[in-house]
Structure formats: C-alpha cells, structure tokens
C-alpha cells in the first residue's frame, strides 16, 4: 500500500493487475527453469502495454530485467517490455525526477543496500569500484525533514538472506544478518530501511528474535509518510 500511496501522491495513475504472481526467481535460483518459465511468460502477458512497471523490490526487478532473458529467448514482447521495468527508487529519481517530498521523519535511519539493487541495478555506487559516489535511495531520503543517517562501517555488505540460501545455509545466513544488525546498532540506527522486502524480513526476524531496539521499515513506507 505504501508504494501505491506514494505514487498516487506524486500524480501517477496506478493500476494493480490482480492476476499477477511471483516473478519466478525462487524457482530459477533453484535450477527449476521449467517451473520459472510459465511465470516469466505470465508476467510478460500481464504487464505488456504499460508505460512503466514499477516494483518496490530490486531483487524482483533484476529478475525481470536481467534474468528473464535466460528463459525467454528471442521473445519480442519481453524485449520491448523489459526497458519499462523500474525499481521504485529508480523510477522516482530517473523518471519522475522528483526533487522534494513533503514528509517529516525525525529519526536516525540506517540504509541497507540490497545486493541486487546495488550490483545488478546500480541503484548506488559500491565500494568494490573506484567510481563516482551516488545513492538513489539515500538521495530520496535526504529530501525528508529531520532525517539523520547512521554511518555504517560496512555500507554495502550482504545481509545474508539470498533467497533459498537462507534455508540451505541457515547458520551462515543468520551470522551474516547478525553482523549487519550489529553494524546498525553501533551506528545508533533507530529505523533500518531498504528497498527489498526480502532483506528487511530477514533482518527484522533477527532483530525481533534477539530483541534489538531497531524499527524496520521499507523505504516506500518512509517516503509515503508512514511512521
């Protein structure tokens, strides 16, 4: 709902096709290409014809833009559609080009960069490359009145979720997640945010289990004025 509220507040006409399903990433990541293929084709069938397809998940967007090509060979409708698929922050910065948001958020925010958003969609610069620094999610958060940012020691480290990795390598996944939470704790994070629900669900689960004093919100909720 936060994504819908946010986009409509910015004057965007939004349609939500109720026939949509999972993008198929869990199946493809598990090597089940034949199970992922009908979901990919269904996505193309449902979303072809829209001016823009916006998703509040860098992981799902990367699946559609970068990995459907593995399944949909020489598929003209897909090739035409894939250029219209945007991660939410990418859409706000690069397409709508918004410069201000009338939202107050007087909290110290810790921004987690998902691996797919960072390294496959290039929503921000990473520490592995000697390139000009940029961060589209942070650019949006900086528009909010009263916001303060946590200074993390490892700004773009993986949270450890990795989809089915969290099941097949549970101990490693949880250790990586707790490392990220510890970094936010030392930085004084009050609200931990990201653009991927998968990362947030993983980190939020560890925060609840370990009873850590950090609130978790998707970036769409913050930008839409939720508290």
PLM region spans:
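Iron-sulfur cluster-binding electron-transfer modules in prokaryotic oxidoreductases
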Residues: 1-227
């Amino acid at each position: 709902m936060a994504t819908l509220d946010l986009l409509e507040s910015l004057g965007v006409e939004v349609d939500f096709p109720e026939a949509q399903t999972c993008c198929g990433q869990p199946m493809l990541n598990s090597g089940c290409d034949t199970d992922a293929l009908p979901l990919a084709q269904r996505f193309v069938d449902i979303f072809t014809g829209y001016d823009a397809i916006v998703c509040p998940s860098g992981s799902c967007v990367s699946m559609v833009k970068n990995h459907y090509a593995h399944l949909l060979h020489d598929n003209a409708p897909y090739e035409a559609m894939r250029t219209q698929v945007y991660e939410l922050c990418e859409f706000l910065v690069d397409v709508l080009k918004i410069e201000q948001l009338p939202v107050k958020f007087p909290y110290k925010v810790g921004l987690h960069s998902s691996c797919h958003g960072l390294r496959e969609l290039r929503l921000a610069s990473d520490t592995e490359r000697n390139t000009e620094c940029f961060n589209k999610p942070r650019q949006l958060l900086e528009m909010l009145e009263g916001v303060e940012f946590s200074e993390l020691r490892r700004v773009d480290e993986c949270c450890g979720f990795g989809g089915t990795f969290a099941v097949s390598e549970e101990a490693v996944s949880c250790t990586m997640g707790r490392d990220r939470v510890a970094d936010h704790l030392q930085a004084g994070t009050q609200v931990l945010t990201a653009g991927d629900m998968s990362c947030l669900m993983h980190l939020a689960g560890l925060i609840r289990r370990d009873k850590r004093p950090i609130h978790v919100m998707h970036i769409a909720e913050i930008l839409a004025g939720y508290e």
